């Protein structure tokens, strides 16, 4: 069962024994879903970063006490105030002070079902954020030169999210690629080809090369214990005359989040979304926007085969080489999201409805 630690701030004028009885309604409701532990503010340093913490404003008159412990407060500062003992007024004062110093703050107050629903969301967010800690993202090669606004500061990203970007030279991939024979990937190629709706471009030789590349990258993922990777695919084409599209598609099917162009922000987005929702996404380029009809056309080449209803084997759009995947998606509602900023502290999010699953180029 999930545990919530309520860091309690109460005025000395109120007896500790009455703390529970004064807030019986909210505490009993929380205990239906969580193990609730009341922690005196003086003991909050005993809690770890894996403990989910809420600041419990139990009474009024604690404003100065809370701000004296500003450095030790959990972030973001979630303040629970049920309104009893003048707690809401105190929470509003504290929240205003915190926000004035650039600290994110939220007050949980109102009807009990609404508070519980919000706690569920916050707990899920916390758990997703903790699951990112220690995750390793492989940067195979270097980001494409045209990604001028997609940089990530490795140190700031690690400090903020606990993730590690690991630079891996393309030479590691080339070495494994040369060691994998055509015979080793023959059966896998036959399986991918037989399940395709059609094969518009690409030769059997192209498919074999693309599958050898998949095996080579998978090997490096295992060696480096990667949860995700981004691949400098255009540099790769110059060296081994194949594209990474199929490899990245199959890696996504394997549960290893994979993106192209060495895009550091997009691969973090895929990893964060998987941690939060448990669902896979895929990278895509906005190809055309019609603001009058509110339509967006997205181009893709690395979608996981499992995410499609059917797929068509194509070649790589820009170079007309290798193998790429044209996925036919089910119609319905989806979310488009992009995390950005050098320390990954910004995001764009929008709901979208897929009305036309595929449009051939």
PLM regions: where:
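Metallocofactor- and cofactor-centric catalytic cores in central/energy metabolism, strongly enriched
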Residues: 3-92, 99-100, 111, 117-124, ...
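Flexible loop/turn segments at secondary-structure boundaries
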Residues: 16, 63, 87, 145-147, ...
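Short, glycine-/small-residue-rich phosphate/pyrophosphate-handling segment
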Residues: 86-128, 275-303
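Flexible, glycine/charged-enriched surface loops at secondary-structure junctions
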Residues: 168, 225, 232, 279-286
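Single conserved hydrophobic/aromatic residue that forms the stacking wall/gate
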Residues: 352-361
